[in-house]
């Protein structure tokens, strides 16, 4: 019989969330031994995961947003444990959870604790792991809302350029991406490297990504020679910028830029001139809905030990 024991690692801001308290009480009534710990500062998630594993917990619940989820997923993977993860989405965006079909209702999300876990991949870059997506936007300054005209033409990529108020403020970076049977070099405006499908609060930069295929989805938004003219033409023609993306699906990709690259890993900043992104197949056991859109393989008949 499966041990019904778990630890909920909850973002400190959610400590007074009555829905969480009620849902935890319900799980305990259902026979779950569910302990709760709160994060307070950077590094707490990893420490609490390690403490939970040392205490014999084989099931962790991540209660928070995308950043909390990334921290806990990374800590579990680094511990090389068979412990599984349930996602309790309590953030603003909840990008991985939404794309994976995890309910946003607290009680319904915790029902997934009783569903057999599935092996999912992680992405790795610069010694850091991510569950959802690495994104990069160039020339963006987060100082104001993106103008309405730009939102119309940029669509799902608009959030990468938050702060732009005129077409002339778009700047490109010269980059080179290399992977198995793939090579692209040129000026780019934005980049998404996804294990999950969406980022920035629902924007599908990698709309067909699967979290269990051992591959990363690459989405490149190239910069045309005349950025302003091209974007204006797209706007006037009512076309979306999704038609401009170059896409690939690779086990690894190397990204180089002499100008340097600012990357966002589910809220974790990373920068560098030469970065290698690698998929880590089956690195984590996650409790997801059986019909989750990000799962492509057939589930195992037996739950992991």
UniProtKB/Swiss-Prot annotation:
GO biological process: phospholipid biosynthetic process
Residues annotated as binding ATP: 39, 65-71, 92
Cofactor: Mg(2+); Ca(2+)
SUPFAM superfamilies reported in the protein's UniProt record: NAD kinase/diacylglycerol kinase-like (SSF111331)
Keyword terms of this UniProt record: ATP-binding, Cytoplasm, Kinase, Lipid biosynthesis, Lipid metabolism, Magnesium, Metal-binding, Nucleotide-binding, Phospholipid biosynthesis, Phospholipid metabolism, Transferase
Chief place where the protein resides: cytoplasm
Active site: 268
PANTHER family named in the record: LIPID KINASE YEGS, SPHINGOSINE KINASE
HAMAP family tied to this protein: YegS (MF_01377)
Family named by the database record: Belongs to the diacylglycerol/lipid kinase family. YegS lipid kinase subfamily.
Protein name in UniProt: Probable lipid kinase YegS-like
Organism: Pseudomonas syringae pv. tomato (strain ATCC BAA-871 / DC3000)
The organism's taxonomic lineage, starting at the top: Bacteria, Pseudomonadati, Pseudomonadota, Gammaproteobacteria, Pseudomonadales
């Amino acid at each position: 019989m499966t041990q019904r024991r778990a630890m909920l690692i909850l973002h400190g801001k959610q400590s007074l969330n009555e829905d969480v308290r009620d849902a935890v009480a319900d799980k305990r009534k259902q026979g779950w031994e569910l302990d709760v710990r709160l994060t307070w500062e950077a590094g707490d998630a990893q420490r609490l995961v390690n403490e939970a594993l040392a205490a014999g917990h084989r099931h962790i619940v991540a209660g928070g947003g995308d950043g909390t989820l990334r921290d806990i997923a990374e800590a579990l993977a680094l511990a090389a444990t068979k412990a599984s993860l349930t996602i309790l989405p309590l953030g603003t965006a909840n990008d991985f959870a939404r794309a994976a079909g995890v309910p946003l209702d607290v009680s319904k999300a915790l029902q997934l604790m009783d569903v057999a876990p599935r092996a999912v991949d992680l992405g790795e870059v610069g010694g850091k792991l991510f569950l959802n997506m690495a994104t990069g936007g160039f020339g963006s300054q987060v100082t104001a809302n993106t103008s309405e005209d730009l939102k119309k033409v940029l669509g799902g990529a608009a959030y990468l350029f938050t702060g732009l108020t005129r077409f002339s403020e778009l700047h490109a970076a010269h980059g080179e991406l290399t992977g198995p049977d793939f090579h692209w070099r040129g000026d780019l405006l934005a980049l998404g490297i996804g294990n999950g499908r969406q980022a920035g609060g629902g924007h599908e930069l990698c709309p067909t990504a699967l979290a269990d295929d051992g591959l990363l989805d690459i989405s490149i938004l190239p910069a045309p020679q005349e950025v302003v003219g091209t974007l204006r033409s797209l706007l006037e023609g009512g076309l979306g910028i999704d038609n401009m993306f170059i896409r690939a699906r690779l086990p690894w990709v190397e990204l180089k830029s002499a100008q340097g690259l600012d990357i966002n890993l589910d809220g974790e900043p990373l920068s560098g001139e030469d970065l290698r992104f690698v998929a880590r197949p089956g690195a984590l056991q996650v409790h997801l809905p059986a019909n989750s859109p990000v799962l492509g393989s057939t589930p195992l008949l037996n739950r992991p030990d």
